[in-house]
């Protein structure tokens, strides 16, 4: 369900409350949510942000009490998710500043961020306090991580580690055709083992 649609909020709160309780009971630290799409409801980005803030404030005390993070995922709208609202970090920062919770932030998907914003390491430094989880994926193509892509993954791993991040990094990619999936994952783990 999309957080930008106010008509969804009651049902989302009910479903998400159960998920928060289950996550806390099973030591699952993060729950991923999505902002929604511009085409849904025909609203402006500002109205969508306001609606997301309203909903996130409704669940704020529950996640703080239960010790679970809500992570709104950043996705690119240029290649993979046309019309997705949270496609630039600054939009998400505005939402998170207004929600004002140490338990509500965003999933910084580095693949998506590189496509729509770039400037990955500076963005991580500037907005790390809102980043509750990270995803990777080779740019371009969302293939496995390697040293012949746009991003220096080892450097990014060091940036994240230097900020004392203790959470998970999800390697969310597809191995290139003909690649060994296990070897690709081992390579990603090696890159991020800093």
Question: Which residues make up each language-model segment?
Answer:
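Histidine-acidic metal/acid-base catalytic patches
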Residues: 21, 28-29, 86-108, 112-194
């Amino acid at each position: 369900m999309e957080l930008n649609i106010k008509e969804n909020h009651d049902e989302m709160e009910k479903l998400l409350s159960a998920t928060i309780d289950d996550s806390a009971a099973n030591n699952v630290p993060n729950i991923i949510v999505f902002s929604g799409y511009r085409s849904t409801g025909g609203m402006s980005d500002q109205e969508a942000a306001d609606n997301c803030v309203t909903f996130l404030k409704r669940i704020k005390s529950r996640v703080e009490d239960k010790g679970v993070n809500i992570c709104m995922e950043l996705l690119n709208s240029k290649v993979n998710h046309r019309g997705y609202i949270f496609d630039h970090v600054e939009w998400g920062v505005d939402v998170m500043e207004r929600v004002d919770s140490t338990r509500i932030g965003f999933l910084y998907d580095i693949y998506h961020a590189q496509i729509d914003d770039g400037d990955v390491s500076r963005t991580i430094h500037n907005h790390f306090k809102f980043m509750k989880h990270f995803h990777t994926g080779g740019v371009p193509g969302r293939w496995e991580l390697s040293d012949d892509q746009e991003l220096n993954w080892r450097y990014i791993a060091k940036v994240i580690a230097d900020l004392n991040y203790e959470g998970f990094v999800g390697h969310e990619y597809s191995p290139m055709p003909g690649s060994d999936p296990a070897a690709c994952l081992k390579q990603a783990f090696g890159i991020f083992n800093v």
